[in-house]
Every structure is written in C-alpha cells, then in structure tokens.
Amino acid sequence: MKAAADRLMAARAREGRTRVLIVDDSAMVRQALALGLSTDPRLEVVGTASGAEAARAQMAALKPDVVTLDLEMPQMDGLTFLRSYMESAPVPTVVISSLTRTSGETAMRAMEAGAVDIISKPSLGAGQGLPAIMRDVCARVWAAARARLALPDGAAPAPVAPGASEDWIHALGASTGGVQALSRILPFFPAQSPGLLVVQHMPEGFTAAFARRLDALCRMRVREAADGDLVLPGLVLIAPGGLRHMEIERAGGVCRVRLVAGAPVSYSRPSVDRMFLSLAAAAGPRVSAALLTGMGRDGAAGLLAIRRAGGRTFAQDEGSSAVFGMPLAARDLRAAEEILTLDDIPARMMLAAAADTRAPSLASND
C-alpha cells in the first residue's frame, strides 16, 4: 500500500515538470548533464542519446519538451539533425557545445535553423564553480522549453532615413530568442544610423561569430566590441560574451566602450543593466534603448534609468517575444514608454533619434 502511495506521489510530483532529452556523443557529458539537470525540481530528464538516430527514436517515443543538443557528433552532425527535425516535428532546442572557431560559426547556423539558445559546454573540471554553472544551464533549459520557435510572420519594417545628430546612441538588450530577433531587425537600420550597442546573453567566444554573421546581413558595420572603442555612426558593437561587462563612458565629448570586470548581474555577464545604467549616466537624453526577448529581469532597471534621464525607451511585446521575461519586467517597472512588436522597434528608435526629443515623463502615463 505504501509503495503504491509513493508511486502516486512521485507521479504527481512529475506533473508539470519540463521533459528533457539530452543528445551528446560523450557518455561522460550525458551523465554530467543528466545529474545536473535533475537537481532542478522543474526538470525531468526523460532520456539520453549518443547520436541522431537514437535521438530521433526517443523524440518520437518520449515527446520531450526540450532537447539539449551537441553539434559535433558522428554519423549525422548536430546541425544537420536539428534542421531535419525542425522541418518535420520542431522541438525547442538548446545547443550545448564546446567552443572552437568552427563550432562558433556552426552554432550561429543552428540558431538560424531554430535553436533557442546556446550554452558553452560545462567543464567537468570546474570544481566548486560547477553547481553555479549548472544552475544557469537549468534555468536556460527550462526557459527554452517555453519559447516560441518562430517569430510571427509580418511585413518587414521599412528602413527609416537617419536624421539624428552624431552623438545620439541606440542600444539593444536581449537574451533567449535574441539571436533571431536581432538578426531580423538589425538589417533595417540604415548604414549611417547612430552608433548602436548590443548586449546579447551568450557564452564567451560565440559573440565574435555572431558579429560576423550580422555584419554580412546588415547595412551598418557590425563587430565585437573591444575596450576603448568609440561609439560611432554606422557601427554596431556587440558586447563580448562571458567574461566582462560592457559599459559606456563619456570623456572629451565622445563615448567609448569600457569592458570591465565584475560579478554576473541577474546571472548574466555581460549584463544589459550594466550597459543601460552606464548609458543613462553618459548620454541620458540622447539615447534610444529597447529591451527584447529573454528570461529574467536583466535590463529592466537600466531601461528605467535611461527613461528617467530623458532617453527614449521601448520593449518588445509578448506576441513577438520568444520569452516574455525581460520585457515584462520592464513593463512592470514602467521603464518602457512603449511596448512594441519586434518589427516596429527599429522605426520607432530611428524616429525618436530623428525627433531628438526627451521622453514623456513617467507621470504622463499614470
């Protein structure tokens, strides 16, 4: 009788848990991920697979809510496998990959194929830091399972002719779903738009590949930011992933990038909040900033600081967000003067810069 009751309680405990399938050719990595993910009560590891064919069978049998996928596997590589099931039976997928230059480029193609997030494969020798790493992995896998797999269809936004002065600055912050969102909207900023700064939550090393992919798509030049870079018209600077925060300082009438050490903020480094807060101090009323799709709260407080400094602030709406977490936090703080569809954000940012007007006061929205 007690055994039956225990089974019933266990079954009830599993209800509502996110079902995870782990796909990796390394038995050691599969075991480490399974153990780590199982520490989160929201997650249930329902299976593991060493390659594409085994994974395909388990996906059909187990119906996972989310897949973690290694890109470098024998027989069929992870990218080819991802493309195959995203076309026929899409499942939210988190790429968990070791970093090489080749894997960075492949990871970007995986995001274009529909993967929701990229995580650098945890080092099994991380020692005391491994639990913190796995907490972040658990949170991102859980969030990925809730992400929309495709942006809503819609007409592409029309480019807006630049009309702002050279010292205006645009800024964007994003997390889960941000690679796809940024790839969609950045090409619509004209070549001589005001300098544009981006923090996208991404592991160390992958942002360089992301910048190269965007540079091929965009009218503006795009590259990974370096310490001391000037914020210039026509240039998009992507915060390097993983190790440091990107802040902006004004000196001698110009704004420069500073890459600074510091603990993660809202579990993130680089942090959107750190960039936005520095922009509020350095450029205040000559900033237009938008907070895009992502889990958590990073960026909401910084967006509010920009608004209070007289800058123009926007957030992505729920309908076009893969994960409506960061924009929701901004809405709850009343940090965004407008909540917009993703496709409307470039035009509104450019119009705000061209008008060069201060944001409406917070009191005006009461």
Swiss-Prot record:
Top-tier EC class: hydrolase
Gene Ontology biological process: chemotaxis
PTMs per UniProt: Phosphorylated by CheA. Phosphorylation of the N-terminal regulatory domain activates the methylesterase activity.
UniProt-recorded Gene Ontology molecular function terms: phosphorelay response regulator activity; protein-glutamate methylesterase activity; protein-glutamine glutaminase activity
Organism domain of life: Bacteria
Intracellular or extracellular location(s): Cytoplasm
Enzymatic reactions: [protein]-L-glutamate 5-O-methyl ester + H2O = L-glutamyl-[protein] + methanol + H(+); L-glutaminyl-[protein] + H2O = L-glutamyl-[protein] + NH4(+)
Ranges where the CheB-type methylesterase domain occurs: 162-356
One Pfam family hit: CheB_methylest
Domain Response regulatory positions: 19-136
Sites bearing 4-aspartylphosphate, chain numbering: 70
Gene Ontology cellular-component annotations: cytoplasm
Listed EC numbers: 3.1.1.61, 3.5.1.44
Keyword Cytoplasm: yes
InterPro entries recorded: CheB-like, CheB_C, CheY-like_superfamily, Sig_transdc_resp-reg_Me-estase, Sig_transdc_resp-reg_receiver
NCBIfam families: PRK00742.1
Function description: Involved in chemotaxis. Part of a chemotaxis signal transduction system that modulates chemotaxis in response to various stimuli. Catalyzes the demethylation of specific methylglutamate residues introduced into the chemoreceptors (methyl-accepting chemotaxis proteins or MCP) by CheR. Also mediates the irreversible deamidation of specific glutamine residues to glutamic acid.
Protein family per UniProt: Belongs to the CheB family.
Entry remark concerning the domains of this protein: Contains a C-terminal catalytic domain, and an N-terminal region which modulates catalytic activity.
Name of the protein in its database record: Protein-glutamate methylesterase/protein-glutamine glutaminase of group 2 operon
Organism annotation: Cereibacter sphaeroides
Gene for this chain: cheB2
